[in-house]
Amino acid sequence: MESKMKVLKLFRTLHRTRQCVFQNDHRALEAARQRINEEFKKNKRECSPAKISELLKFGTDVEILLRTSVVQGIHKDSDTLVLQARKDLLLDNIPFCDAPEKQT
């Protein structure tokens, strides 16, 4: 019963993340909705606890990747694209960080 609750929670979380990440982009919202629903339906009859755990981990990783990596761009002119950064967007650029390294 606990795994059913985790699956349902992940399902809801993925849909909430989809709505946040693809806000006002109806084509992307619909495509993401269909893909999420399709993947959950495909694995609906899974009974193996190990496989369920693996799928939950994969779904959680996908949610984190969507939330922290996807940037939405909006066309303003024919040659202008404005990027909308969300608060959850991962902005670290570690390999090119300007801060000096601390010596130990």
UniProtKB/Swiss-Prot annotation:
One of its GO terms (cellular component) is mitochondrial matrix. Its main location: mitochondrion. InterPro entries: Complex1_LYR_dom, Complex1_LYR_LYRM7, MZM1/LYRM7. It is found in: Mitochondrion matrix. The keyword Kinase does not apply. Disulfide bonds: none annotated. Keywords: Chaperone, Coiled coil, Mitochondrion. GO terms for biological process: mitochondrial respiratory chain complex III assembly. Residues 21-48 form a coiled coil. Pfam families: Complex1_LYR. The keyword Transport does not apply. It comes from the Eukaryota. One of its GO terms (molecular function) is protein folding chaperone. CDD domains: Complex1_LYR_LYRM7 (cd20267). Interacts with UQCRFS1. Assembly factor required for Rieske Fe-S protein UQCRFS1 incorporation into the cytochrome b-c1 (CIII) complex. Functions as a chaperone, binding to this subunit within the mitochondrial matrix and stabilizing it prior to its translocation and insertion into the late CIII dimeric intermediate within the mitochondrial inner membrane. Belongs to the complex I LYR family. This is Complex III assembly factor LYRM7. It comes from Xenopus laevis. The lineage of its organism: Eukaryota, Metazoa, Chordata, Craniata, Vertebrata. The gene is lyrm7.
